[in-house]
Amino acid sequence: MIKEQQPTPPVHKSLWHGGFAMLALAALLLAASAYMLLALIPIGRAGNVDFVVSQPTAHMWYSLAYAVGLFFFGPLCNWLVQRYRRGIVCVRATELYAACIVVSWFVFRGMLPVDFFGLVALRFITGAFYALAVMVLLNTLVIDKSESNMRTKANHIMAWLLRFGMVLGPLVAIVVSRKAAVSDVCVWALAAAVIAAVLVRLVHLPFKTPEEDLHHLSADRFLLPGMWRLFFFTCLCFACFGYVFSFVSSVAFYAMMLVGFLWALISERFNSVFVHSDTNLLVAFFFILSAMSVFCSPDGMLPGYFTPCLLGAGIGMAGARAQLMFIDSSGHCRRGTAVTTFLLACESGVAIGLAVGFAIAN
């Protein structure tokens, strides 16, 4: 008589075990670190820092170079995580990203003179290594450390942590720049990146045998085909934040955006059906358009604190629903690809919005 095979019991009954918690904190720190760096130009413009305002038309190109760099390692991502130990790939990418922060600190201190093309190259490389670290973290490590029935929830939590990092990064950068030199923001960004690398290094990750038919360049873990309209919509929503990000250097603005995020989270908590409906996207887009109509008006920020709160709620709702749509369209085997596609839509949207804001300001 053949004995029936028993299903393998889950390794972790709860999503929030030690390994997942460390990866979650690493994701938050990485995002905060990147957005501390992105906040340097708006803060420098507001404070009239010579390095930042010396080339008025260059800021747009710095942001565009960063946006292009985000996609650089995408075709290699699947090969890298299968050819080498996936945790080490994330750690090394984070370390190289941290090295870019060190170079940025020398540049801002005036100790490393570089021309326009050197700065464009620096922003490109910074975006490339940051994106590689976050891609591997989200599309591979988080999935490896989550049970199959908890992976959508895990992806959802990570995306929210990245959004909080987008706001906490500039918030910390503004506070630090007011208490010390603008270049000291790089020190805080470096500390966040180093701690993130240490956290990832401490997580035990299982070894997996690489695929037999492995190609150096692949769309796996990079871009999900057939999702261009949703990619464009997500990119557009986050570009609105990037545009406002280009000229706002107020603690109150980012604090109220955090309130907007909490608003979106509460709406998810008490109305889960609403989160999974397309009505959520319409409401989110209405919130974003309402906020942007105020920011683009001649009166600017006159309506007060409610406008950034509305923008935060809209971006939070749109991001949450768009991510679920990416995952639902991918199927089980391409979850990592869907997560990366959503990530790149968000990050490139912010960078493009920054470029547009700098171009209009100039």
Task: Specify the residue positions occupied by each region the protein language model found.
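Hydrophobic core of transmembrane alpha-helices in multi-pass small-molecule transporters
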Residues: V114-A133, L302-A318
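C-terminal transmembrane helical hairpin of 12-TM major facilitator-type secondary transporters
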Residues: S277-A322
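Cytoplasmic helix-loop-helix junction between adjacent transmembrane helices
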Residues: L122-L161
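Symmetry-related core transmembrane helices of the 12-TM Major Facilitator Superfamily/SLC fold
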Residues: D184-L202, N362
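Glycine-rich segments within core transmembrane alpha-helices of 12-TM secondary carriers
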Residues: M150-I174, L343-L354
